[in-house]
A protein has these predicted regions:
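Bacterial N-terminal signal peptides that target proteins for export
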Residues: 1-6
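Bacterial N-terminal signal peptides
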Residues: 7-15
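Ser/Thr/Pro/Gly-biased, low-complexity, turn-/loop-rich segments
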Residues: 20-274
């Protein structure tokens, strides 16, 4: 009886060994496949190219590879990098802004034109970083490791690839006017032009009654925001980069909408400028 039990135990041991050995190649193969999967994916929509990396790399490497894939001669100030893993954050911001505008439109129906304007644009989660290749090469602090800023993405515990979109475009030739106007306008860039020069190009009566007629905001292509006073008693010089957005803000908003102008500005900083 003892001999039979010993034989059975030995058989089970050998069976487990064979099973473990048969699983080992599969585990190694799976591990190898995971190692080969891209940990970082950067899409260049303008060039129709996707750059894949098996590990995170620095911005300089991506810009060098982009140049090698047809992105030579892009305009650095209007270049945009978007963090696709963080997209829900911008989607939530857009939903919040549209809801605020819908509520405002119950009191001020003219606000509906702003809803139409904002909904016509594409927004992605902007990864704000200097995309001037010369600056990235010469200044180490401008050459970060590309890592998603999404709070929901636990990189150490997730196999999810980090995904970015990099828009590298030629120098824009226009400036976009949005906000408290009847509709969006793309105006030809005026060298050394000031806000009055652009507003004079709009059709007569284009500004809404609820528009702020003393100040506006300029969202530069790199995401920097400048407030510009343009009333005759407090006007000041301003710079409009090629591809800038001029936001005509609302004036004298009810207290419950006190943050609306700033929320719209923040949303427009994430607009895909194509």
């Amino acid at each position: 009886k003892r001999t039979a039990l010993a034989s059975l135990g030995a058989a089970l041991f050998l069976s487990n060994m064979v099973h473990a050995q048969s699983l080992e190649p599969h585990a190694q193969q799976l591990k190898a496949q995971q190692a080969q999967q891209p940990k970082l994916s950067v899409e260049l929509p303008v060039q129709g190219v996707t750059l894949n990396y098996t590990q995170p790399v620095r911005l300089e490497q991506v810009l060098n590879d982009a140049n090698a894939n047809g992105a030579l001669g892009y305009f650095p100030l209007s270049a945009q990098l978007f963090d696709r893993n963080a997209q829900p954050q911008v989607d939530n911001l857009k939903a919040q802004v549209i809801e605020q505008l819908n509520q405002l439109a119950l009191q001020k129906p003219q606000a509906r034109s702003v809803i139409t304007q904002l909904e016509s644009f594409d927004y992605q989660a902007r990864y704000f970083v200097d995309l001037d290749r010369n600056a990235v090469i010469s200044q180490p602090e401008k050459n970060p490791l590309l890592v998603s800023k999404s709070s929901a993405l636990e990189l150490e515990q997730s196999n999810q690839a980090q995904r970015f979109d990099l828009y590298l475009t030629p120098r824009p030739i226009d400036v976009t006017v949005v906000g408290a106007v009847k509709q969006t306008h793309k105006l030809t860039l005026i060298e050394h032009g000031q806000l009055d020069n652009y507003l004079s190009k709009l059709p007569k009566g284009e500004l809404l009654e609820i528009a702020d007629r003393s100040a506006a905001f300029v969202i530069q292509p790199d995401g920097h925001v400048d407030e510009i006073s343009y009333a005759y008693w407090n006007s000041k010089q301003a710079y409009f980069a090629p591809g800038a957005i001029v936001f005509i803000a609302f004036d004298s908003l009810p207290s419950e909408f006190s943050a609306l102008n700033q929320n719209i500005i923040e949303l427009l900083r994430h607009k895909v400028n194509l």
